[in-house]
Amino acid sequence: MQYKKSLVASALVATSLAAYAPKDPWSTLTPSATYKGGITDYSSTFGIAVEPIATTASSKAKRAAAISQIGDGQIQATTKTTAAAVSQIGDGQIQATTKTKAAAVSQIGDGQIQATTKTTSAKTTAAAVSQIGDGQIQATTKTKAAAVSQIGDGQIQATTKTTAAAVSQIGDGQIQATTKTTAAAVSQIGDGQIQATTNTTVAPVSQITDGQIQATTLTSATIIPSPAPAPITNGTDPVTAETCKSSGTLEMNLKGGILTDGKGRIGSIVANRQFQFDGPPPQAGAIYAAGWSITPEGNLAIGDQDTFYQCLSGNFYNLYDEHIGTQCNAVHLQAIDLLNC
């Protein structure tokens, strides 16, 4: 009997040592491996957009909506595919919607519909992720190009609709539009959750004066002219997308492999494998609180892994570093520069 009690006590001690306690040095909670060529210091404030890996191979130009964050730091996204920006609510969660929209085509004077075939700007315009209060990252099931927001708890949430820039019309009636898809920024609500829509919006087609409708084979979004972010100091800038930030947009900084949001909370993988922002220090039981980087492809990575999973939770997706259930899809978290515009 005494032997059994000793085994139980040993198991409890081992379990407690495997998780973070508030008094521990949380900055040492790093994965054992690092991403080859990853950047652990980035000089500019940036956001993230959820990019389903299934679409990455087919088109690097198509971006998912940026993630939002609610107050508790969680990251979430909706299931409809929209171009809505991802927001962050108060808890730090990240959330985003899932609806996809196309950019409008422009028309010139002759009535033709036209769209450009190349984007002149070096950076793609994407919507930023918002954050709610709890720091969690979440996304809605509709696919929109809306920016990801963050709510109060730090969770990250985003909708699933992808939105594209509207197409313009020139004097001859032709419709013209650019060729890159712009994603909405992820927002953050009070709890730190990250949210973003998943609907993809296509930009409207433009029309020139002759009435012809023209458009290129690639869907593009309007590039926002703005000053370039400050250059990074340890290599080529891997971030190729940018967006205008707005209230609730998840704003992140990366320094020495430590990821923080606009409120100074620590980006971490918590005990249930969810990505959210807390603290400092991170919440008890956190698995990783350091070891973040931006890959040469412009994706957020933890350790040597740049694949995350958006898993359906009610009307939103939460973001995890592991596949935890049947309603989970592999995604990349694309870094996007945030602009004041």
Curated annotation (Swiss-Prot):
Propeptide stretch(es), residue numbers: 19-63
The PIR1/2/3 repeat ranges on this chain: 64-82, 83-101, 102-125, 126-144, 145-163, 164-182, 183-201, 202-220
Signal peptide: 1-18
Swiss-Prot/TrEMBL keywords: Cell wall, Cell wall biogenesis/degradation, Cleavage on pair of basic residues, Glycoprotein, Repeat, Secreted, Signal
Top-rank taxon, per record: Eukaryota
GO molecular function: structural constituent of cell wall
Gene Ontology cellular component list: cellular bud scar; extracellular region; fungal-type cell wall; nuclear periphery
InterPro entries, per the entry: PIR1-like_C (IPR054508), Yeast_CWMannoprotein_PIR (IPR051153), Yeast_PIR_rpt (IPR000420)
Record PROSITE patterns: PIR_REPEAT_1 (PS00929), PIR_REPEAT_2 (PS50256)
Annotated site residue numbers, Covalent attachment to cell wall glycan: Q74, Q93, Q112, Q136, Q155, Q174, Q193, Q212
Induction: Positively regulated by signaling through MPK1 in response to cell wall perturbation. Expression is also regulated by the SWI5 transcription factor.
Compartments it resides in: Secreted, Cell wall
Pfam families attached to this UniProt entry: PIR, PIR1-like_C
Positions of the record's site feature: Cleavage: R63, A64
A Gene Ontology BP annotation from the UniProt entry: intracellular protein transport
Post-translational modification: Covalently linked to beta-1,3-glucan of the inner cell wall layer via an alkali-sensitive ester linkage between the gamma-carboxyl group of glutamic acids, arising from specific glutamines within the PIR1/2/3 repeats, and hydroxyl groups of glucoses of beta-1,3-glucan chains.
Remaining remarks: Present with 1170 molecules/cell in log phase SD medium.
Free-text comment about domains: The PIR1/2/3 repeats are required for covalent linkage to the cell wall. Their number varies among different strains of S.cerevisiae.
Protein function: Component of the outer cell wall layer. Required for stability of the cell wall and for optimal growth. Required for resistance against several antifungal and cell wall-perturbing agents and for tolerance to heat shock.
Family in the record: Belongs to the PIR protein family.
Name of the molecule in the record: Cell wall mannoprotein PIR1
Species of the source: Saccharomyces cerevisiae (strain ATCC 204508 / S288c)
Chain's gene name: PIR1
